[in-house]
């Protein structure tokens, strides 16, 4: 009870000062079963062990939602109500419990992060998420990238059969990367999720079409995941390299004293300075897509339409807004 009171005090402190939203990190792990005898676990229990029952030992326990209901009561005392989004690695059937209007209201849906860029896979993932949200009177919260993942443009430019962890350990040299294809596929995926019902979160740098920085030297790696995992996983620094604002300079405009993580030379051509001058750049496409999304908002519904090509998906929203996505490797 004392910890819960302190959480509410802290949330209120920041909400009173105008903070609009809160991201709840590892939202599935605020409650644990510490009843004796304590269990002796060799590794942290994963999704397979926890399943969809809410009976995990260390995570995703049903007692969590009593806590989040109290938080929601606090958030709703503000006008407008404060937004909260859960980062919860849980069974898909559990996601709506975190995204309920009675709890946090939103929960990242990570299924697209590792969904192959294929029409069938995208449709199945979309339909499953929407049906689950509707069943629980919740909404979907889509994302393609975050600070813990290889940038999605890079994933989509690699052969799907490539072991990405081994590829990263080779500094991106063990298999070829098609950066152009990855960028184009990444843009198509973004336009797809922006047209879906629900909310969308974007990770800094994806609006520039940035790829993973794969060749950070060992001496410059800062992510403790690299050392903690005995160097069998290069870590997450490759997606955390500071953004390029200008096409040149000691840190491509990030600051005057250099960058805390090394930036590759190719960052200059992906800089804001360069892309703002190109009407067809990823930055221009993102800006226009966000404008259209705002203009075309409609009821949280979707209708699928048949296409003559299995590599093309077509859906519409109630106001006549249509989204047609080509998942083929070449132009249609």
Model regions and ranges:
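Active-site and adjacent substrate-binding regions of carbohydrate-active enzymes
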Residues: 1-332
């Amino acid at each position: 009870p004392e910890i819960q009171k302190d959480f509410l005090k802290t949330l209120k402190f920041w909400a009173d000062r105008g903070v609009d939203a809160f991201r709840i990190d590892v939202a599935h792990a605020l409650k644990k079963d510490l009843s004796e005898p304590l269990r002796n676990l060799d590794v942290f229990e994963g999704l397979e062990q926890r399943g969809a029952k809410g009976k995990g030992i260390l995570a995703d326990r049903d007692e969590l939602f009593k806590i989040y209901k109290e938080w929601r009561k606090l958030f709703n005392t503000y006008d407008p109500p404060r937004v909260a989004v859960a980062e919860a690695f849980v069974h898909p059937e559990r996601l709506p419990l975190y995204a309920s209007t009675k709890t946090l209201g939103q929960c990242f849906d990570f299924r697209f992060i590792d969904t192959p860029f294929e029409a069938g896979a995208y449709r199945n993932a979309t339909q499953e998420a929407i049906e689950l949200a509707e069943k629980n009177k919740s909404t979907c919260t889509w994302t393609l990238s975050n600070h813990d993942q290889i940038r999605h443009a890079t994933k989509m430019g690699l052969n799907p059969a490539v072991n990405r962890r081994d590829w990263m350990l080779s500094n991106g040299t063990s298999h070829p990367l098609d950066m152009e294809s990855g960028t184009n596929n990444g843009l198509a995926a973004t336009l797809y999720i922006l047209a879906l019902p629900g909310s969308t979160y974007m990770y800094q740098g994806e609006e520039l079409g940035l790829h993973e920085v794969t060749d950070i030297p060992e001496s410059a790696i800062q992510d403790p995941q690299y050392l903690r995992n005995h160097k069998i996983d290069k870590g997450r620094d490759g997606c955390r390299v500071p953004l390029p604002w200008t096409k040149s300079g000691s840190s491509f405009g990030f600051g005057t004293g250099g960058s805390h993580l090394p930036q590759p030379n190719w960052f200059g051509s992906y800089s804001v300075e360069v892309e703002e001058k190109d009407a067809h750049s990823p930055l221009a496409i993102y800006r226009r897509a966000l404008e259209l999304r705002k203009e075309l908002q409609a009821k949280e519904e979707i209708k699928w339409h048949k296409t003559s090509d299995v590599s093309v998906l077509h859906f519409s929203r109630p106001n006549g807004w249509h989204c047609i996505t080509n998942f083929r490797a070449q132009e249609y």
